[in-house]
């Protein structure tokens, strides 16, 4: 659903400073671009170029596995996860803030809909406004 992604990016823009917006975008794109460009040449098919010193069938696979016991693909996936983790953590924080803000707005609407102006309701509304001020960047 593209609507979720659009809402998430709008929230990121709302909760970021100008420097943060540029930093997040450039750094994430740069990291993924470098990883994608370097990934093929660094973690490409090395086994086809590997030569075995005997003509025995299956020797190339056994020799390659002996020389390189761990596949390069898990390293590439691990690096991709490490590269994207800071951005994903920030996006998770933005999702948390937007949901918290949504709950506070809903609670505020429910309290404002009450017919009586009870002092407890006024205090609760003031508390919600303070919490909303903490969430807002502006």
From Swiss-Prot:
GO terms for biological process: cell communication. The chain crosses the membrane at residues 17-39, 75-97. It comes from Sus scrofa (Pig). One gap junction consists of a cluster of closely packed pairs of transmembrane channels, the connexons, through which materials of low MW diffuse from one cell to a neighboring cell. It is a multi-pass membrane protein. It is found in: Cell membrane; Cell junction, Gap junction. Residues 1-16, 98-138 are cytoplasmic. A connexon is composed of a hexamer of connexins. Pfam families: Connexin (PF00029). This is Gap junction alpha-4 protein. InterPro entries: Connexin (IPR000500), Connexin_CS (IPR017990), Connexin_N (IPR013092), Connexin_N_sf (IPR038359). Belongs to the connexin family. Alpha-type (group II) subfamily. Keywords: Cell junction, Cell membrane, Gap junction, Membrane, Transmembrane, Transmembrane helix. Residues 40-74 are extracellular. Its main location: membrane. GO terms for cellular component: connexin complex. Coiled coil: none annotated.
């Amino acid at each position: 659903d593209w609507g979720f992604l659009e809402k998430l990016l709008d929230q990121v823009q709302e909760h970021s400073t100008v420097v943060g917006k540029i930093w997040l975008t450039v750094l994430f794109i740069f990291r993924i671009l470098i990883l994608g460009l370097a990934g093929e040449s660094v973690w490409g098919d090395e086994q086809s170029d590997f030569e075995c010193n005997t003509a025995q069938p299956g020797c190339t696979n056994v020799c390659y596995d002996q020389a390189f016991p761990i596949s390069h693909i898990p390293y590439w996936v691990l690096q991709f996860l490490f590269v994207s983790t800071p951005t994903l953590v920030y996006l998770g924080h933005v999702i948390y803030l937007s949901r918290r803000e949504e709950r506070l707005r809903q609670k505020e609407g429910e309290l404002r809909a009450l017919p009586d102006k009870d002092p407890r309701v006024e205090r609760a509304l003031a508390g919600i406004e303070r919490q909303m001020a903490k969430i807002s960047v502006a």
